[in-house]
A protein has these predicted regions:
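Solvent-exposed, non-transmembrane regions of membrane-associated and secreted proteins
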Residues: 1-183
């Protein structure tokens, strides 16, 4: 099996890190969070095309309590997160045993996950595939360092993990929300 560069980078740093927007709203990946020996690889990933979702992969997410309704794209690299919520390649598909890992920005490109910190246990996270919807219920929220990749580990039951930078406009930590399948 060939190791993909994105998977290698994500094995040492969680997705979503970027520099604060400049006066024109431009931003870029936060290279300070990336180990120096992996920096050339990260820079080379900028133009990788976004894969098309298979029928059982996530295509949309809704989180009613924080007014999220956004597309889900495959991959969680810089270019993918410009288009919506990114599903970590290699994570489980919705409804399957394992961990569906989804990430999005909190302060650029739609600020999709800006209000993850407002989620409380019992809130719903609805994930759509081309075939059906899956309702997950929030269990807990934690703050971690960008290198805490263990939050993306596979699980023995159907779960979803939502990841974004935190706090707003500072982004030196990650907020991680865990939810379990309800239906």
């Amino acid at each position: 099996e060939t190791v993909t560069p994105t998977a290698l980078v994500m094995a040492v740093v969680l997705p979503s890190g970027h520099t604060p927007p400049d006066a024109q709203g431009n931003t870029r990946p936060n290279e300070a969070e990336i180990p120096s020996h992996l920096l050339p690889m990260v820079q080379s990933l900028a133009n990788i095309p976004v894969p098309t979702a298979a029928p059982d992969q996530a295509v949309r997410i809704q989180i009613p309590s924080i007014n999220v309704d956004a597309p889900v794209v495959q991959g969680d690299g810089w270019e993918q997160l410009k288009k919506g919520v990114g599903q970590y390649i290699g994570s489980a598909n919705p409804g399957h045993d394992g961990n569906v890992v989804l990430s999005a920005h909190d302060d650029v490109y739609g600020e999709i996950f800006r209000y993850l910190d407002r989620l409380v246990p019992g809130d719903q996270v609805i994930i759509y595939t081309q075939q059906r919807q899956f309702v997950y219920v929030v269990d807990r929220t934690v703050l971690v360092e960008p290198t805490a990749v263990e939050v993306m580990a596979s699980t023995g039951s159907p779960t979803v993990t939502l990841i974004s930078c935190y706090p707003y406009l500072i982004n030196d930590q990650r907020i991680v929300v865990f939810a379990r399948l309800q239906n």
